[in-house]
Amino acid sequence: MSGSAGSGGTTGSARKRIMKEEDMTKVEFETSEEVDVTPTFDTMGLREDLLRGIYAYGFEKPSAIQQRAIKQIIKGRDVIAQSQSGTGKTATFSISVLQCLDIQVRETQALILAPTRELAVQIQKGLLALGDYMNVQCHACIGGTNVGEDIRKLDYGQHVVAGTPGRVFDMIRRRSLRTRAIKMLVLDEADEMLNKGFKEQIYDVYRYLPPATQVVLISATLPHEILEMTNKFMTDPIRILVKRDELTLEGIKQFFVAVEREEWKFDTLCDLYDTLTITQAVIFCNTKRKVDWLTEKMREANFTVSSMHGDMPQKERESIMKEFRSGASRVLISTDVWARGLDVPQVSLIINYDLPNNRELYIHRIGRSGRYGRKGVAINFVKNDDIRILRDIEQYYSTQIDEMPMNVADLI
């Protein structure tokens, strides 16, 4: 490898290639040259019992990110993978983690950090499902749950721990989570974690890991501050990145409804309710207060909705998610806590009651309404003073958001 020819493993030729890009706002880096494509799961050199789990789970053919990243991770390389929601990124690292385990050794060999409790639990469930024939032990280590239970589970021995950085670090500090056998650290939704809140805690966790630990970082967006951070704890990483303007929104029809004033949004939503319940819909608000207010108001008007935000107790959030997943509730009102990585395939309509506070969140909200290339519809409620933000989002993603047609129900 010629990784020494530049900072953080960017080779000279790669750096020249980056400089050639005229518009740096559109493009981060390109995929490393040595990344080849493995078109089927059968040709990845995976263990038999894992392959059985993959096919039993319903996967047939690897997605683009899986075709590129799994082989590199299994080889032991540090990997930065840029991949939006709905591309199969969770399965990418889950399959790789399962392949690298020594099931005979009942110690933690892989650690996966995620920004929200829900996402950590979803990762854990995915690992248990994919590893169904391997007899894998996997625990979700998350805040808001019983510490004693965590300690008991960890003492029993877990091959993989998925969790939120705060609780994971707490367990390492208490010596309940032993790090000596850890071979791999996965940072999922890294942009969100390294944002503000979890940066310090990730560093704290990282300091306790064996020096040779392999690091895999997965993220929908890669702001430069993340790429700088990867230099600190990755060695000559392979980059598997796509140009930003190819990053999803494909197959998702995006519309806006002009509402002059905030008060008009509610009536607009009520008019749309019959359309919402054709399949399942998620409605995003920017604040917890707004979620509670809107839920209350919808129920007063005799509409059936459920709601979720970060202030709710863990148990309550879990039962709401379960209800929504099973289809028992059709409309979920939420803050951005829902926008990251939560997988409900039936959701084919997203409504931004409020436009997101930052444009990078837009893709996290919308990118899930058309999972795995399925079609979806996104409707943005836009007040007069939001037009500017909408245009900014359009430009940022090189996409088009048209006024909502009358026959929107036919598109869902």
UniProtKB/Swiss-Prot annotation:
Binding site for ATP: K61, Q66, G86, T87, G88, K89, T90, A91, D343, R368, S369, G370, R371, Y372
GO cellular component, one term: cytoplasm
Pfam families: DEAD, Helicase_C
Chain positions covered by the region annotation Disordered: 1-20
Keywords: ATP-binding, Cytoplasm, Helicase, Hydrolase, mRNA processing, mRNA splicing, mRNA transport, Nonsense-mediated mRNA decay, Nucleotide-binding, Nucleus, RNA-binding, Spliceosome, Translation regulation, Transport
Domain of life: Eukaryota
GO molecular function terms listed in the Swiss-Prot or TrEMBL record: ATP binding; ATP hydrolysis activity; mRNA binding; RNA helicase activity
Short sequence motif named Q motif, residue ranges: 39-67
Quaternary structure note: Identified in the spliceosome C complex. Part of the mRNA splicing-dependent exon junction complex (EJC) complex; the core complex contains CASC3, EIF4A3, MAGOH and RBM8A. Component of the ALYREF/THOC4-EJC-RNA complex; in the complex interacts with MAGOH, RBM8A and THOC4 (via the WXHD motif); these interactions are likely specific to RNA-bound EJC. May interact with NOM1. Interacts with POLDIP3. Interacts with CWC22 and PRPF19 in an RNA-independent manner. Direct interaction with CWC22 is mediated by the helicase C-terminal domain.
Entry protein name: Eukaryotic initiation factor 4A-III
Organism the protein comes from: Gallus gallus
